[in-house]
Amino acid sequence: MTRVMASRTVPWIPVEHRLDVILSPDLPPADGTTSAFVFVSDSTGRTLLTCVDRPGRGWDVPGGHLEAGESASEAAVRELQEETGLLLEPSALSVFAWQRIELLRPAPAGYRYAPLTYMVMFRARLAAPGAATAPPAGSESTGAEWLPRARIKELCAHRTWLPLLERL
């Protein structure tokens, strides 16, 4: 079942738009999917986050843009390893949500995204407590930590994906 959990706007999209957070076990249309993220939870209920030391980033769910020819699950696994050092197989992931971004006015010159795009949200669950992990050398991330939900809510109150945290 597909269900809209929240709708909002964000300051990093330079035109009138709507961002919907959608709970769904199915992938969104592949031709509009631009990025993939993965919520990894361990047996203690903690979730692995990464810290990106760039303006506007900070603590976030590991993920990023798809590369040419890459599936959403392949991108999620690659980004997870690049940003946290944790390596999972694509088969360990399941789709549970996505974010749909729809531009409501024409995009400004130079805007690189289509008027309708999607960000896929995967989840994975570890059967044991998550081991300490760190981003590999050269990563854009400066740290990775297994955090309890209360701490995630403090650090990530502004994140569009926050309504999904309770669905892990």
How does the language model describe each region?
Residues 1-39:
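Acidic, metal-coordinating catalytic segment for phosphate/diphosphate chemistry
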Residues 2, 72, 153-157:
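A binding-site-centric feature that preferentially detects glycan-recognition modules on secreted/surface proteins
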Residues 21-27, 99-105, 112-116, 149-152, ...:
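Class I (Rossmann-like) S-adenosyl-L-methionine-dependent methyltransferase catalytic domain
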Residues 28-29, 38-40, 46, 66-68, ...:
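Hydrophobic alpha-helical segments that drive targeting, anchoring, or assembly
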Residues 42-83:
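Conserved Nudix-box catalytic region and its N-terminal flanking loop in Nudix hydrolases
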Residues 46-47, 128-133:
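Short helix-loop capping/hinge motifs at secondary-structure junctions, enriched
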Residues 86-130:
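Active-site segment of metal-dependent pyrophosphate-handling enzymes
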Residues 120-123, 132-166:
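NUDIX/MutT-family hydrolases
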